[in-house]
């Protein structure tokens, strides 16, 4: 029996992070967590590229373009969608989630969903580095694990 697993050793990997400017109080913290996670696991600082987009709805397009470039072993999408008075947040979250998943499936490059969806700003702050950890850091470790797993699968 063969068991395939990724590792948390990021040396040699090239990672792109795509970050939403909307709710930047939160997304800046997610970005800090993602960069910290990548660096702590051996990804070289000069192998990390960052692209900014207006909002979470725009994440999939830029993730797709970066994945198609063949320059990256994984892409991390970071955003924060917070419930408002209307259902707008549901549409944004659904489009971002579906679009980011399609990037991975269409390009074969892991695109990690680091978009937090919360009911309020307090929950978002908790998920961006306080009580609930930092989802950006978690996305970084998932990116490394998926990139190294695919390298092993590809032989």
From Swiss-Prot:
Task: Cite the binding residues for (2S)-2-hydroxy-3-oxobutyl phosphate.
Answer: 85-86, 127
Q: Which Pfam families match?
A: DMRL_synthase
Q: What UniProt keywords are attached to this protein's entry?
A: Riboflavin biosynthesis, Transferase
Where along this sequence does the record place binding of 5-amino-6-(D-ribitylamino)uracil?
22, 56-58, 80-82, 113
Region forming the signal peptide: none
Its domain of life? Answer: Bacteria
Please name the catalytic residues of this protein.
Answer: 88
From the Swiss-Prot or TrEMBL record, what is one GO molecular function term?
6,7-dimethyl-8-ribityllumazine synthase activity
This enzyme catalyses:
(2S)-2-hydroxy-3-oxobutyl phosphate + 5-amino-6-(D-ribitylamino)uracil = 6,7-dimethyl-8-(1-D-ribityl)lumazine + phosphate + 2 H2O + H(+)
Pathway(s) the chain acts in: Cofactor biosynthesis; riboflavin biosynthesis; riboflavin from 2-hydroxy-3-oxobutyl phosphate and 5-amino-6-(D-ribitylamino)uracil: step 1/2
Alphabetical GO biological process terms: riboflavin biosynthetic process
Establish whether keyword Transferase is in the entry. Answer: yes
Enzyme Commission no: 2.5.1.78
InterPro entries from the UniProt entry: LS, LS/RS, LS/RS_sf
GO CC entries? cytoplasm; cytosol; riboflavin synthase complex
As for family, the record states: Belongs to the DMRL synthase family.
Tell me the function of this protein: Catalyzes the formation of 6,7-dimethyl-8-ribityllumazine by condensation of 5-amino-6-(D-ribitylamino)uracil with 3,4-dihydroxy-2-butanone 4-phosphate. This is the penultimate step in the biosynthesis of riboflavin.
Q: What is this protein called?
A: 6,7-dimethyl-8-ribityllumazine synthase
Q: Which organism is it from?
A: Chloroflexus aurantiacus (strain ATCC 29366 / DSM 635 / J-10-fl)
């Amino acid at each position: 029996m063969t068991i395939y697993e990724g590792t948390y050793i990021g040396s040699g990997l090239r990672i792109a992070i795509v970050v939403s400017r909307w709710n930047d109080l939160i997304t800046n913290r997610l970005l800090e967590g993602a960069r910290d996670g990548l660096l702590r696991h051996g990804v070289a600082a000069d192998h990390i590229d960052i692209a900014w987009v207006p909002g979470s709805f725009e994440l999939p397009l830029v993730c797709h373009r970066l994945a198609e470039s063949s320059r990256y072993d994984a892409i991390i999408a970071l955003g924060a969608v917070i419930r408002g008075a209307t259902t707008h947040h549901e549409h944004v979250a659904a489009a971002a989630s579906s679009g980011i998943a399609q990037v991975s499936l269409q390009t074969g490059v892991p695109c990690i969903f680091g978009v937090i969806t919360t009911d309020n700003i307090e929950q978002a702050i908790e998920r961006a580095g306080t009580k609930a950890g930092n989802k950006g850091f978690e996305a970084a470790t998932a990116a490394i694990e998926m990139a190294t797993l695919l390298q092993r699968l590809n032989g």
